[in-house]
Amino acid sequence: MEPGPGGRGAARGQRPPNAAQPREQERKLEQEKLSGVVKSVHRRLRKKYREVGDFDKIWREHCEDAETLCEYAVAMKNLADNHWAKTCEGEGRIEWCCSVCREYFQNGGKRKALEKDEKRAVLATKTTPALNVHESSKLEGPLTNLSFTSPDFITELLQASGKIRLLDVGSCFNPFLKFEEFLTVGIDIVPAVESVYKCDFLNLQLQQPLQLAQDAIDAFLKQLRNPIDALPGELFHVVVFSLLLSYFPSPYQRWICCKKAHELLVLNGLLLIITPDSSHQNRHAMMMKSWKIAIESLGFKRFKYSKFSHMHLMAFRKTSLKTTSDLVSRNYPGMLYIPQDFNSVEEEEYSNTSCYVRSDLEDEQLAYGFTELPEAPYDSDSGESQASSIPFYELEDPILLLS
């Protein structure tokens, strides 16, 4: 005789399929509440910046607001621990950073990049005999006189043979600490855990590089004192900006961060940038192209680019010891824009209660200032293609909800 409405499952004490729904709804409500805390901080910063215009003053006041910062840090840690980890399997931003570092430092990625540099330099000298000395050296970069058998080249490749020195800016809860290959320094304006140092990266003072052996530099990092107000230049193999740059209300603040990262990295070190975006890859290619041009102008070369369902992930390699940007002929800081930079105060308030989507025409008008960016269909060390001129617009930080 077949079981009745109770069924075998009920006889064995199994829950009906919809029993987990209340728990899932509760989890989503908590996630929305936490993401609301984070987004409200971002919105207030952008609103103040539009009203006042003095990003130094706004940032100083923000860093003094201990209650808001503490609430933000707790919300971010809770989101990362209890929500993002459960909904982003296979798309973890931390795992991506580790994978890129292993590929670059341990599995030949760095060697291949340096070999490409030398081939480009040799090709440039063969195909452009009419160039003067200044133009030629500009094209060839830092590896003009670097042979694969030279001591300098061997030293460069072995520099990170020990632990990879990694600076995690806006670390919150120090997610890289658990990985053995890294000597991690996590910094944040309000740390969520004790292992993260208190530090305002925007106002971090940079000192002369240490003239020490690698093991002595490692020892120096292990003895840092809290809070951190200054650091020597050329100290780290990796600098990570995970969901950091979109926190700042001003493109110039994002620019300052990238410039400081360049100065803190050793030659051929990596800058890893993760920024939120839930749209498909091509829709926001214009912004990514703009960011690439601005960041490379500092003395970087893009090594890798990936698009996950809720974020862009970029790796840039430091290719020159000094920053090279010409801010007179081009507004590179302004090229580090995010969609929210174009919002009005009314639109920010409106986005609290409903989802507003601009028309294609409004998108084109907002992005008009960036339509003349140079084309670069193959624009990275890895030869990845990212060519698109489709404009975009977005109000929120969608990664926070991950719906």
UniProtKB/Swiss-Prot annotation:
Belongs to the BMT2/SAMTOR family. Residues 1-10 have a biased composition (Gly residues). This is S-adenosylmethionine sensor upstream of mTORC1. Residues 23-32 have a biased composition (Basic and acidic residues). S-adenosyl-L-methionine binds at R93, G170, D188, D200, F201, S242. Residues 11-22 have a biased composition (Low complexity). GO terms for molecular function: methyltransferase activity; protein-containing complex binding; S-adenosyl-L-methionine binding. It comes from the Eukaryota. One of its GO terms (biological process) is cellular response to methionine. SUPFAM superfamilies: S-adenosyl-L-methionine-dependent methyltransferases. Keywords: Methyltransferase, S-adenosyl-L-methionine, Transferase. Interacts with the GATOR1 complex; interaction is disrupted when SAMTOR binds S-adenosyl-L-methionine. Interacts with the KICSTOR complex; interaction is disrupted when SAMTOR binds S-adenosyl-L-methionine. The keyword tRNA-binding does not apply. S-adenosyl-L-methionine-binding protein that acts as an inhibitor of mTORC1 signaling via interaction with the GATOR1 and KICSTOR complexes. Acts as a sensor of S-adenosyl-L-methionine to signal methionine sufficiency to mTORC1: in presence of methionine, binds S-adenosyl-L-methionine, leading to disrupt interaction with the GATOR1 and KICSTOR complexes and promote mTORC1 signaling. Upon methionine starvation, S-adenosyl-L-methionine levels are reduced, thereby promoting the association with GATOR1 and KICSTOR, leading to inhibit mTORC1 signaling. Its EC number is 2.1.1.-. Pfam families: Bmt2. Residues 1-32 are annotated as: Disordered. PANTHER family: S-ADENOSYLMETHIONINE SENSOR UPSTREAM OF MTORC1, S-ADENOSYLMETHIONINE SENSOR UPSTREAM OF MTORC1-RELATED.
